Amino acid sequence: MPQTRVSIFDTTLRDGEQSPGCSMNLTEKVRMANKLQDLGVDIIEAGFPIASEGDFAAVRAVAAQCQNVKVAALARTAEQDVARAAEALKYASHPRIHTFVATSDIHLEHKLKKTRTEVIEMTRAAVRQARDYAEEVEFSAEDATRSDVDYLCEVLDVAVEAGASVLNVPDTVGYTTPVEFTRLVQQVRKRVVRDRDVIISVHCHNDLGLAVANSLAAIEAGARQVECTINGIGERAGNASLEEIVMALHVRADRLPFETGIKTTELYPASQLLSNIVGFDVQPNKAIVGRNAFAHEAGIHQHGVINNPLCYEIMTPESVGVTANSLVLGKHSGRHALALRYMELGYDITPAELDVAYKSFTNLADRKKRIYDQDLISLLSSTARAAA
């Protein structure tokens, strides 16, 4: 089955940095941007230039440094925002201005204090201004999933008429569900895009733990750009995780016939670099890049993995840049894993010695959360003394 290309829009440096405790200085942003370029993302959203001098400088530095990737700068639908974004992107080889305004009634009434008509005019003016500066303009309808669908489509249509070539449909507060989001993307595709050369993008937050599921549903419904972050960092509960989306498409190509330009073997190194920069480790059981993603403790699982890793792994550790899987020795481990670990440590033990060592091992594992190699060596010494 032929595969359809989906663009990866990485917003680690912009939305990701808004995650509490995840701020980066200019040097760190450039370092991370270079890694993202090596990873093969299509677009790097480098920051929000009007927000601060630091953000402006970071966008300018990333734009100058990363010449083999599109670089985007965020701007509200305000004249000074768009002008500042354009200035920051001055040295980009492939610049994109990403302008946005909210379209939900709750945002219009309580945040913007604007009427629907005023927001339409703001959209038209900002996109036109952005097109004067950049060949490529992306428009986002903030809080799209809580917006009136008829009004949302009206605003998006105005953005296309004004020159936007990418329409982003954000689930700003992580409110939607996969079935609901599928219908919304289909509506935008049918009523706004039609036969025009316009890309539908999605940007999902993880407040209900559905960011990746919603992103994949949107791709199936016709979205051809997905916005995401390394390790899923971002506002509140975070964004859709880049590595999870990419590997879902990679592993389930039978069900999801889509491809990206991501070098999957660079996923784990990119995750580790980000963690080192922000000092914010991913949870151990995080899919794809967590410490336990390829770790096995249960004895039945360990036996299967020893015989053939595919018994309990749907991808190889090496495919995402992890050197090997890990058999974690703990209270649920079996004899096969213990015997293998002794062999790796250079010990050739008999079945009888293994029986004695295993009994001592299970007793120790009931008392200790982690078993170290020195513990295993000590157990063997105790076994030898008992035999003597």
Where are these regions (language model features)?
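Domain-level signal for soluble alpha/beta catalytic cores
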Residues: 1-5, 11, 17, 71-74, ...
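A mid-to-C-terminal "edge-of-domain" accessory segment
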Residues: 5-6, 12, 247, 255-388
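Alpha/beta enzyme core
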Residues: 6-8, 18-43, 56-65, 79-200, ...
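Catalytic alpha/beta core domains of metabolic enzymes, predominantly
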Residues: 176, 183-308, 312
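Conserved active-site and cofactor/substrate-binding residues in soluble primary-metabolism enzymes
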Residues: 24-27, 31, 53-57, 80, ...
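Short catalytic-loop micro-motif centered on adjacent basic/acidic residues
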Residues: 43-47, 70-73, 139-141, 201-203, ...
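An N-terminally biased module of ancient metal coordination in phosphate/nucleic-acid-related enzymes
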Residues: 15, 20, 209
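Short, ordered loop/turn segments at secondary-structure junctions
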Residues: 13, 48-49, 74-77, 101-104, ...
